[in-house]
UniProtKB/Swiss-Prot annotation:
Main location: cytoplasm
UniProt keyword terms in alphabetical order: Cytoplasm, Elongation factor, GTP-binding, Nucleotide-binding, Protein biosynthesis
GO BP, sorted A to Z: ribosome disassembly
Subcellular location: Cytoplasm
Entry binding sites for GTP: 18-25, 82-86, 136-139
Source domain of life: Bacteria
Similarity-based family: Belongs to the TRAFAC class translation factor GTPase superfamily. Classic translation factor GTPase family. EF-G/EF-2 subfamily.
Organism of derivation: Chlamydia trachomatis serovar D (strain ATCC VR-885 / DSM 19411 / UW-3/Cx)
Function: Catalyzes the GTP-dependent ribosomal translocation step during translation elongation. During this step, the ribosome changes from the pre-translocational (PRE) to the post-translocational (POST) state as the newly formed A-site-bound peptidyl-tRNA and P-site-bound deacylated tRNA move to the P and E sites, respectively. Catalyzes the coordinated movement of the two tRNA molecules, the mRNA and conformational changes in the ribosome.
One cellular component term from this protein's GO annotations in UniProt: cytoplasm
Domain tr-type G: residue ranges: 9-288
GO molecular function: GTP binding; GTPase activity; translation elongation factor activity
Protein's name in the database: Elongation factor G
């Protein structure tokens, strides 16, 4: 099917998101199978899943990068992004959600809402992404559809409404009652679930289904209060409401984020996946439903609103970079307005650099098809972009628009890295540069005192997998040091500095004079450097050099050399010499000035605090809490169900190395835990002194 056959209202850009092991990739595999994209079902546990195409993913059985693919169903074109569920790969989820119009949240019928489900849900709230939910693994021991829905309401604050009533559960799960059509679907094993029989509702479920349907209709009546005819029917004659009417109101409720309908099934056992595909098309929004995209016009500084139209000016967002051994650098983009043609020259407005598109590719996991153009609503990949990275805006050369960026969280863990042989030094530098372009949460820096190269990321698994990729994709063997905490420094009060950099050594000298004011910025806002120079006391051609010097000075703090964060710097005054001043002199002076100001601004060291969730048998609860307290943990809450307790706490990362091993020995291997970065906080004075001594 060519794209020309699809209007914007028939496009669905969706993500599949969940906690690790909820069965997200298996669900996507079934979608590909039923929509005719694959002829054999790939199994994750056999390492044959189409979407998990990186070698490490097939070995580890987890999804690391967001694979993109396109399928066709009920006359609609569905672009699907399968996102990772492990906390170390949060940026993959974040950048997918930024470019999606809707999402399917997959939950495990036994566990319900798990810690990573909460993280992903919060990220989707941030971007206002409409969601439907699929309670998967209904065939597992202990599966509880209504329990999972209850946990969605309690933990996520979701307006979770069942649209199915399961028939049987665990090994007896055979199908479900569709509360909208009031039909019972029994799946036929011999057709791999591709066919089912429709029957009447079993007698023992009739009363429960009637109650659930009434609750569903009453909830829908509150979605659109202007639809008085629907409300009247719900109150006076609910049996007269047609399926069509229900779907219309449901779609409105989902798109406005007022309702999260919940389906059930077992992707592994091929039950319920086509029903999920049906409602993706019926209820999730098209690019038109998501409305205009907002950006900033760089020439005027004003906010602009772009209609999703293929005839409008080009506005696209780069949301992922990938390096391919055969094709080179691939940039994934989402087009919000206009059309992008192969061979066209465009502007990266974020960087103010011109780019040229050499090829356009439609992706199916790691297979690709060449395309001549992409138009509004498409998600695709381009080859030939040299400067564009995650979060950059691409637009027409005469239409300078910048879209909202993708925020990357600060890394929390550092490791020293060096090539195994001196000859690999150049290759290692290239590999690190390529990987940090692909992944904004992976940073590379140099320790100024030791000269060591330091890599920083979101967790041990994150850095471990990147090291694997260096060996496999870039053929670089590297030694890595022990993981260390990625501390930061910041300031706690306002201060200023006046710095002169003067050098006379025969011939032309060096002269620069810079006055700065610095103050603490809001936590999480990052560093800001602004020039308040008036009257040309520092000529405007030297201002960028001062700013660059200040930024470089902030890269290493004054207490223990850790990068400074959340500092606002204003360049307020200075002077220059007609002959001796130069860009280099002002850059050096800017760096010296910011260091001097920081020393006077009561600097402190910050450490990453992790949100830790432990699920333990109740008889070990006291030991687990005692152990978290000893690790400087702050217990946030605990809850119990079925002899198991869940404890959530905030604990400094520096206290969490080797935690899994000690948790296993505390609980005889019966407890599990997850942790994710929460925020940075000031370290206690005594620990700060120890860090500075090191």
């Amino acid at each position: 099917m060519s794209d020309q056959e699809f209007g914007l209202d028939a496009i669905r850009n969706i993500g599949i998101m969940a906690h690790i092991d909820a069965g997200k990739t298996t669900t996507t595999e079934r979608i590909l199978f039923y929509a005719g994209r694959t002829h054999k079902i790939g199994e994750v546990h056999e390492g044959g899943a189409t979407m998990d195409w990186m070698e490490q993913e097939q070995e580890r059985g987890i999804t690391i990068t967001s694979a993109a693919t396109t399928v066709f169903w009920l006359g609609a074109k569905i672009n699907i992004i399968d996102t990772p569920g492990h906390v170390d790969f949060t940026i993959e989820v974040e950048r997918s959600l930024r470019v999606l119009d809707g999402a399917v949240a997959v939950f495990d019928a036994v566990s319900g809402v798990e810690p990573q489900s909460e993280t992903v849900w919060r990220q989707a709230n941030k971007y206002g992404v409409p969601r439907i939910a699929f309670v998967n693994k209904m065939d597992r021991m202990g599966a509880n559809y209504f329990g999972a829905i209850e946990s969605m309401r309690e933990k996520l604050g979701a307006n979770a409404i069942p649209v199915h009533c399961p028939i049987g559960s665990e090994s007896q799960f055979v199908g479900m009652v569709d509360l909208i059509s009031q039909k019972t679907l029994y799946f036929l094993e011999e057709t791999l679930g591709a066919k089912w029989e429709e029957r009447e509702i079993p007698e023992d479920l009739q009363e429960q289904c009637a109650t659930l349907r009434m609750q569903l209709l009453e909830e829908l009546a509150t979605v659109d209060e202007s639809n008085e005819a629907f409300m009247e029917k719900v109150l006076e004659n609910p049996d007269s409401i047609t399926e069509e009417e229900i779907h219309t109101v449901m779609r409105k409720g989902v798109i406005e984020g007022k309702i999260n309908p919940v389906l059930c099934g077992s992707a592994f056992k091929n039950k319920g996946v086509q029903q999920l595909l049906d409602v993706i098309v019926k209820w999730l929004p098209s690019p038109l439903d998501r409305g205009n995209v907002r950006g900033i016009n760089l020439k005027t500084g004003e906010e602009v609103s772009l209609k999703p139209s293929k005839d409008g000016p080009l506005a696209a967002l780069a949301f992922k970079i990938m390096t391919d051994p055969y094709v080179g650098r691939i940039t994934f983009i989402r087009i919000y307005s206009g059309t992008l043609k192969k061979g066209s020259a465009i502007l990266n407005s974020t960087k103010d650099k011109k780019e040229r598109i050499s090829r356009l590719l439609e992706m199916h996991a790691n297979e690709r098809t060449d395309r001549d153009e992409f138009t509004v609503g498409d998600i695709g990949a381009c080859v030939g972009l040299k400067f564009s990275v995650t979060g950059d805006t691409l637009c027409d050369e005469n239409q300078e628009i910048v879209l909202e960026r993708i925020e990357a969280p600060e890394p929390v863990i550092d490791m020293a890295i060096e090539p195994k042989s001196k000859g690999d030094r150049e290759k290692l530098a290239q590999a690190l540069s390529a990987l940090s372009e692909e992944d904004p949460t992976f940073r590379v820096s140099t320790n100024e005192e030791t000269g060591q190269t330091i890599i920083s990321g979101m967790g041990e698994l994150h850095l471990d997998i990147l090291r694997d990729r260096m060996i496999r994709e870039f053929r670089v063997e590297a030694n890595v040091g022990k993981p260390q905490v990625s501390y930061k420094e910041t300031i706690t009060k306002t201060s200023n500095s006046e710095t002169k950099y003067v050098k006379q050594s025969g011939g032309r000298g060096q002269y620069a004079h810079v006055c700065l004011e610095i103050e603490p910025n809001e936590p999480g806002k990052g560093n800001e450097v602004v020039s308040k120079i008036v009257g040309g006391v520092i000529p405007k051609e030297y201002i960028p050099a001062v700013i660059k010097g200040v930024e470089e000075g902030l890269n290493s703090g004054v207490l223990a050399g850790y990068g400074l964060v959340d500092v606002k710097v204003s360049i307020v005054f200075g002077s220059y010499h007609e002959v001796d001043s130069s860009e280099m002199a002002f850059k050096i002076c800017g760096s010296m000035a910011v260091k001097e100001a920081c020393r006077k601004a009561l600097p402190v060291i910050l450490e990453p605090i992790m949100k830790v969730t432990v699920i333990t048998p109740e008889d070990h609860l006291g030991d687990v809490i005692g152990d978290l307290n000893r690790r400087r943990g702050k217990i946030l809450g605990q809850e119990s169900s079925r002899n198991m307790a869940q404890v959530s706490a905030e604990v400094p990362l520096s206290e969490m190395f080797g935690y899994m091993t000690s948790l296993r020995s505390l609980t005889s291997g019966r407890a599990t835990s997850t942790m994710e970065p929460a925020f940075f906080a000031k370290v206690p004075q005594k620990i700060q002194e120890e860090i500075v001594k090191k």
